[in-house]
UniProtKB/Swiss-Prot annotation:
Keywords: Cell membrane, Membrane, Transmembrane, Transmembrane helix. This is Uncharacterized protein HI_0874. InterPro entries: O-antigen_ligase-rel_domated, WaaL-like. Its main location: membrane. The lineage of its organism: Bacteria, Pseudomonadati, Pseudomonadota, Gammaproteobacteria, Pasteurellales. It is found in: Cell membrane. The chain crosses the membrane at residues 6-26, 27-47, 60-80, 111-131, 147-167, 173-193, 195-215, 220-240, 328-348, 362-382. It comes from Haemophilus influenzae (strain ATCC 51907 / DSM 11121 / KW20 / Rd).
Amino acid sequence: MIQEKHLTFTINLLVSLFFLTILIIPKGYNYAPIILSAIGLIYFIPLKKKLSFSSEDKKLIFSFLFYFFTFLLSIIINKDGIREIDNPSRLLLFIPLLLLFKNFPIKRKTILYAIPSSALITGCVALFQKFALGYEKPFPETMHIQMGNIAISLATFSIVITLHFFIKKQYKSTLFGFVAIILAIMTSALSGARGGWIGLPVVVGIILFLYKEFINKKLIITLIAIITIGLTALITSPKFGIEKRYNAAKSDIVSYLEKNNRNTSLGARFDMWENALIAIKEAPIFGHGSDGYDEFRHKQVKSKQMAKTTLNFGSLHNQYLESWVKRGLVGFIALILIILTPIFYFIKNLNTHNLETKCICILGIIHIVSHIFYFTSQSFLAHNSGNIFYFSAMLCFIV
C-alpha cells in the first residue's frame, strides 16, 4: 500500500510539473492532470475510500456536470456527432481530481514556487526559440492565441505571488518573481496574440485592490510605473512586433466601422459576431449545434450576409457567443455557472488572516477574471489546452 506521505509528494510533484511543462513540452498541459485524475480514480474507487463532499464541492461538481450535460443535450437535440463530447468529457476527469486535492491538499509552497518558475523557464525557452532558433512564434505546437493567453496568466499569477513574497519580506523571492513576470509577459508578446492583453489593466487593478491593506501607495505607484515602463519598452521594440499588431488592429476596426470591410482579421470576427446574434434568434434555447451552425454560416455566406473569409475560422472567437449559438441559452447558462461557481468560492474564502491562503484565493479570483476577458476574443474552452488549463489551474487553487 502506498503511504500517504508518498502520495502527497507525488501529487505535489505532478502539480509542479503541470505548471512547469504547460507550454514548453508539446501538449504538456495534458500529462500531469491525466495522471492525477487516474490517481484520484484509483484512490477513491478500487480502494473504496470514503467520499466527503462539502456544499461548495457539490456546487462545483454540479456546474461541471451541467456544463458537460449541455454537450450531450446538443448531440440529442441538434444531432451533433459524438466527437462533440471529446473535449468536454475531460470535465469528468476533474471530479476525482477535486476529491484528490480535497483529501491531499496541495502544499502552498508548491504553488508559490512552481508558477513563477514556470513563467521564468517558459520565458527563457520562448526567447531562445524566437531569437536563437529563428521560430516565427515560440511553442508552435500550441495555437498561438491559447499560448499567449496562458503566458499572460502565468504573468498575472506571478504578480500575485511576487506581492505575497514582498509582504512576507522575502526579498530574494520577490526579485525572482519580478524576473518571472517580465519573462512571462515577453512570452505573450512573442505569441502575436492580442486578446489576452485587453483585460490586463483590470486584472492588475484587482490584484492591487485585494492587497491594498498590505501595500502602501508608494509601492503601488512604483509597481504601476515599473509595469508601464516595461510594457512601453515591449510595445516600442520592433523585435516583439506589438506596435505593428496594435496598428493593424486599429486599421481593421476603422476599416470595418467606416467601410464595412469584413475581409480583415478583426473585420471577419465582427462579422461573425453580428451573424451570431441572428443565429441565436433562430434557435435561442438549445442552439444550432456545431453542424447546424456550419450550415447557418454557409447559408449566410451564400446570401452575402456574411463574408466568405469567416469560413476560414474554426470557431466564433468568442466563448460566450460560441456557447449560445451552438448550445443555446442552456449552454450559455452552463458557461456562466463554471465561471461564477468557482469565483464565489474564492471570494468566500478570501477573508482570512493566513497570507498563504489569501494569496491562493487571489490566484483563483485572478484566474477566473482573466478568463472572463479571454472568452471575449477567443473560444478558449473549445481547445484542449484552454479546457484543461482553465479547470486544472482552478482546482489547484481550491483551498
